[in-house]
């Protein structure tokens, strides 16, 4: 995405620091005129109240081509820092020449008051005719049958290309033919942006062309009195062959309506604009608009709700009364209303929307008319454009808050009962809260595994299960799933599971005693309690609910065999398995294990140490892996790494991926999957840096962006830094990473260069990590705060063994002025 706001909807405001907002002149224009008309003047610019901290900008560009000149004017609000008036000649001729004027001010309202091209100095110097002849054209339409001109002396080549101009109110493909003093498609001398005007050129017009499409997504709930709505969008350059799509859905429910809008690039076949009325009332009504096109840039240009909505006819009230709600939040305060005549049933359900940048769970309660009651608000529709739609009438309509976190620890039994506190998380609508606790007693030690969080499992009353009671090793678990209230998974102590074991006389069997995620070599022997007849030696693997553990266990048992858990394979969300192959038969694979996150600067230049403090034994279908992700935005860098066992079924492989590079941010990864003993042993980030290209750092350009990388929490940087030349827009987004023992959300701000794509492209996995990217236009309700670890202030740390429970993030809001 570019730096233009993805969607601006009238009436939307934001809480910002208490600084007066400026009023700026607001207008944009593009036109081809005769040079003889210069200097040109303009008047009648509108006015716009900016966001707090924004300034006013003036931007003018003139492209001279013989007797013709193309004029671009942009006035309005901008986040760019103040800039004194600056005139730059991008090309001086002979032949085609380009000059620009830019200024950003904050010293007073309407300070962007330039109203003439006179500010751009003198016209190009007259020249003597030469011998070269070239077509002459400046047109927004076509250059067919363009007249020829005699080029000025010094012109050596004919230029023929399309200049794409993209800015606030400017969406132009300017056809240009004329004289130049050099070959190649370089009319702009490498310039890609002038202020907030983004530019590119294309001189290869044979074959499929990459379209520019309006792009963005929006979800809003409003009063019907706000209709009709209008909007503007951002834009993106598609891959060759892709088309532009737009999808709008309106749900009206009484005096409220819900609107979902998504636009962008697609590989779908062309579809003429189609209006579908999925439900017409009385009561709830639903209409959608779908369009896919390839006939021109920005052909997905619907900008108003006019085609979708007409005021419904007045209807008499009936006798049915239903609760009324249309909300992406809560329906707790929904009121009961009298339905219009013809309504036969009350609807209550959750409409889930996924796709096209839309992630929403809309709670709907209202009146409908249908022959049979049921969960069929959309009359069987399952997709609307790129959006998958699903409804569920069996879920509660409010998202629960649950205690959230994981813990693994080995303690002396004398310390029982243990207590803990947990973080919290907002679940998806329909999910419940779960508590899972497992205790394994072995002599004087106890292994505790705890996981809390959200779950899709059905409600389950608190249940204590004794999987093995001893003598010797004993295993007990506690599981519960609830939805009756927020934070109902409130287990905070081992007390419900544990009571001091009865005193038993010692027996005659002696066995090694071990609890470890590392190794059990040279484990001390213990005298087993009476009744113990065999020694147990195995590896207990736990996977699920945020738990990844391979626990080596040696101790006393009252029966032979590899059956510590008496056949149990799942405990809550955790899958459990055990392996007891004797040493002579073992084919166990050991891998280094640990998670690294480090924040600093210069990581793209100098290697960072990357070693693991421990190892683990993998399951039979797992191999070793190491994954390293580098994010370098210029002034700040971050490394995130994982070593351990892979997901089941992985194959040997080594790879380096570069997702983004200079002149924008550098985002790259190193991954290795291998199947020999401790083969994931890279000890520094040089395994990645040694392969990355080392281009020369470009000189500073014209674009300024905030630069930030945050591993825990959101970027709050407001200071802008000048981007390298070639960067054309600012990026702001989050990347959620999960896997390999790491769960975090990385917040990123920085410079980006064309093509305008997500930072990770289409990548959903990075080695062992699953990755989900969301940019700054994503709906706020869809984002949950990244959990904060108890030792966040240590900017470099390894997570191994005992995991701290997670705590919530809170943010302050400045009062309105």
Curated annotation (Swiss-Prot):
Tagged with keyword Membrane: yes
Database matches in SUPFAM superfamilies: Snake toxin-like
Reported consequences of knocking out the gene: Mice are viable, fertile and are born at the expected Mendelian rate. Slight decrease in blood CD11b(+)Ly-6G(-)Ly-6C(+) monocyte and CD11b(+)Ly-6G(+)Ly-6C(+) neutrophil populations. Lymphocyte and myeloid development is not affected. In S.aureus-mediated skin infection, recruitment of neutrophils and monocytes to the infection site is transiently reduced. In thioglycolate-induced peritonitis, recruitment of neutrophils is normal.
Subcellular location, principal: membrane
Signal peptide region: 1-21
Transmembrane segments: 797-817
Entry membrane topology: Single-pass type IV membrane protein
Example of a GO biological process term: innate immune response
Location of this chain's protein in the cell: Cell membrane
Residue intervals on the Extracellular side: 22-796
Glycosylated residue positions: 115, 189, 379, 566
Domain UPAR/Ly6: 134-203, 322-393, 511-581, 705-774
Tissue expr: Expressed in neutrophils.
Reported function: In association with beta-2 integrin heterodimer ITGAM/CD11b and ITGB2/CD18, mediates activation of TNF-alpha primed neutrophils including degranulation and superoxide production. In addition, by preventing beta-2 integrin internalization and attenuating chemokine signaling favors adhesion over migration. Heterophilic interaction with PECAM1 on endothelial cells plays a role in neutrophil transendothelial migration in vitro. However, appears to be dispensable for neutrophil recruitment caused by bacterial infection in vivo.
PANTHER family on file: CD177 ANTIGEN
Protein name: CD177 antigen
């Amino acid at each position: 995405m570019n730096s233009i706001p993805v969607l601006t909807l009238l009436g939307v405001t934001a809480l910002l620091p208490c600084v007066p907002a400026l009023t700026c002149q607001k207008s944009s224009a593009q036109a081809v005129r005769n040079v003889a008309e210069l200097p040109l003047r303009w008047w009648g610019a509108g006015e716009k109240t900016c966001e707090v901290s924004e300034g006013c900008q003036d931007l003018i560009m003139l492209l001279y081509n013989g007797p013709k000149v193309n004029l671009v004017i942009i006035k309005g609000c901008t986040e760019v820092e103040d800039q004194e008036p600056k005139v730059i000649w991008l090309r001086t001729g002979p032949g085609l020449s380009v000059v620009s004027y830019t200024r950003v001010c904050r010293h007073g309202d309407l300070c962007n008051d330039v109203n003439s091209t006179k500010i751009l100095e003198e016209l190009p110097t007259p020249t003597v005719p030469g011998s070269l002849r070239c077509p002459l054209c400046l047109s927004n339409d076509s250059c067919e049958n363009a007249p020829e001109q005699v080029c000025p002396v010094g012109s050596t080549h004919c230029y023929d290309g399309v200049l794409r101009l993209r800015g606030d109110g400017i969406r132009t493909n300017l056809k240009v033919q004329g004289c130049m003093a050099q070959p190649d498609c370089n009319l702009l001398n490498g310039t890609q942006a002038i202020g907030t005007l983004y530019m590119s050129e294309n001189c290869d017009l044979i074959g499929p062309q990459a379209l520019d499409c309006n792009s963005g997504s929006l979800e809003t709930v409003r009063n019907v009195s706000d209709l009709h709505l209008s909007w503007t969008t951002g834009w993106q350059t598609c891959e060759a062959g892709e088309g532009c799509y737009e999808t709008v859905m309106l749900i009206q429910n009484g005096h409220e309506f819900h609107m979902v809008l998504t636009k962008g690039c697609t590989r779908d076949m062309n579809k003429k604009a189609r209006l579908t009325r999925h439900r017409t009332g009385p009561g709830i009504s639903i209409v959608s608009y779908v369009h896919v096109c390839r006939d021109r840039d920005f052909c997905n240009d619907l900008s108003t709700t006019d085609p979708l909505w007409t005021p419904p006819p007045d209807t008499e009230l009936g006798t049915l009364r239903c609760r009324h709600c249309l909300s992406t939040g809560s329906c707790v305060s929904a009121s009961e209303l009298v339905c219009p005549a013809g309504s036969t049933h009350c609807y209550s359900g959750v409409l889930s929307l996924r796709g096209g940048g839309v992630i929403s769970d809309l709670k709907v309660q209202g009146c409908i008319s249908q022959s049979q009651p049921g969960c069929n608000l959309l009359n069987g529709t399952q997709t609307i454009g790129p959006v998958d739609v699903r409804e569920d009438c069996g879920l509660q309509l409010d998202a629960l808050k649950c205690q959230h976190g994981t813990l693994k620890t080995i303690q002396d039994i004398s310390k029982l009962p243990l207590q803990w506190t947990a973080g919290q998380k907002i679940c998806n609508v329909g999910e419940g809260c779960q508590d899972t606790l497992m205790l394994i007693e072995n002599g004087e030690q106890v292994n505790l595994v705890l996981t809390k969080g959200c779950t899709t499992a059905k409600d389950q009353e608190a249940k204590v299960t004794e999987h093995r009671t001893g003598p010797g090793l004993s295993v007990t678990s506690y599981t519960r799933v609830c939805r009756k209230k927020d934070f109902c998974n409130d287990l905070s102590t081992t007390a419900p599971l544990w009571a001091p074991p009865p005193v038993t006389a010692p027996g005659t069997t002696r066995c090694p005693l071990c609890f470890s995620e590392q190794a059990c070599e040279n484990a001390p022997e213990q005298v087993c309690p009476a009744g113990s007849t065999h020694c147990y030696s195995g590896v207990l693997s736990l996977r699920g609910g945020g738990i990844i553990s391979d626990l080596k266990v040696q101790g006393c048992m009252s029966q032979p065999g590899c059956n510590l858990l008496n056949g149990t394979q799942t405990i809550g969300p955790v899958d459990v398995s055990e392996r007891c192959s004797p040493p002579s038969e073992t084919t166990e694979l050991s891998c280094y294990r640990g998670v690294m996150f480090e924040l600093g600067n210069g990581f793209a230049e100098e290697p960072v140490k990357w070693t693991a403090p421990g190892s683990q034994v993998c399951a039979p279908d797992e191999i070793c892996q190491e994954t390293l992700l580098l994010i370098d935005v210029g002034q700040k860098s971050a490394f995130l790494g994982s070593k351990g066992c892979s997901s089941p079924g992985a194959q040997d492989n080594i790879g380096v991926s570069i997702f983004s590079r200079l002149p924008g941010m550098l985002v790259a990864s190193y991954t290795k999957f291998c199947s020999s003993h401790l083969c994931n042993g890279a000890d520094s980030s040089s395994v990645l840096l040694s392969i990355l290209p080392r281009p020369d750092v470009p000189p500073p350009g014209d674009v300024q962006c905030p630069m930030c990388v945050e591993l825990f929490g959101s970027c709050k940087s407001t200071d802008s830094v000048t981007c390298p030349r070639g960067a054309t827009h600012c990026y702001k987004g989050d990347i959620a990473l999960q896997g390999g023992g790491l769960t975090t959300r990385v917040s990123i701000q920085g410079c980006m260069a064309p093509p305008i794509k997500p930072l990770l492209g289409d990548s959903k996995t990075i080695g062992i990590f699953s990755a989900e990217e969301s940019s700054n236009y994503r709906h706020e309700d869809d984002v949950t705060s990244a959990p904060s670890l108890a030792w966040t202030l240590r900017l470099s740390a390894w997570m191994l063994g005992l995991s701290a429970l997670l705590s919530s993030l809170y943010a302050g809001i400045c009062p309105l002025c």
